[in-house]
Swiss-Prot record:
GO terms for molecular function: translation elongation factor activity. This is Elongation factor Ts. The lineage of its organism: Bacteria, Bacillati, Cyanobacteriota, Cyanophyceae, Oscillatoriophycideae. SUPFAM superfamilies: Elongation factor Ts (EF-Ts), dimerisation domain, UBA-like. It comes from the Bacteria. One of its GO terms (cellular component) is cytoplasm. Belongs to the EF-Ts family. Its main location: cytoplasm. HAMAP family: EF_Ts. InterPro entries: EF-Ts_dimer_sf (IPR036402), Transl_elong_EFTs/EF1B (IPR001816), Transl_elong_EFTs/EF1B_dimer (IPR014039), Transl_elong_Ts_CS (IPR018101), UBA-like_sf (IPR009060). It comes from Trichodesmium erythraeum (strain IMS101).
Amino acid sequence: MAEISAKLVKELREKTGAGMMDCKKALKETDGNIDKATDWLRQKGIASAGKLEGKVATEGLVESYIHTGGRIGVLVEVNCQTDFVARNESFKELVKNVAMQIAACPQVEYVSVDDIPTEFVESEKSIEMGREDLSNKPENIREKIVQGRIGKRLKELTLMDQPYIRDQNKTIEELIKETSAQLGEKVQVRRFIRFVLGEGLEKQESNFAEEVAAQTGKK
């Protein structure tokens, strides 16, 4: 068993907000491993979730989802702050549901509006400003209309702004916040990719009779 030093106990106390004796016991139970001791304290309901606020969310799961028929596939990374939460069934269920959401949203390309490149936003603005239905509008009115249209367009492209497929009254962002509050630590979708069978490929059309003839060596 590793030696449980006063320095180690102090470090765990600062990280979790738990009492000295609880920290010492947690470290003994986990052979001096700080991360495992933190999980042990949280499992016992002793650690303060508030102490985790400044911790970077580097734990979590990468989930895959293949839609029925194998024509659509998704990979998504969802992060949390501790391995303890990453193993939680509620967290696992969230990640699975997010993957299914992405599969159901072909227009979604980004996690949030903040991820959309400035160049794209400026291009959309330029297109909207040049539309004929705005040509006779005063500049300030035109600007407001364009901002509204762009805002709507950007939300269509972002995962966080999508209505949750299992409850249309809430967005994915609200679902993430609810789960984060339930688990007591920060939860965030970091990245995802969506695959569609044959996407980007030009399907070659052929005459079935000619194809059979070619395969059998007949003309």
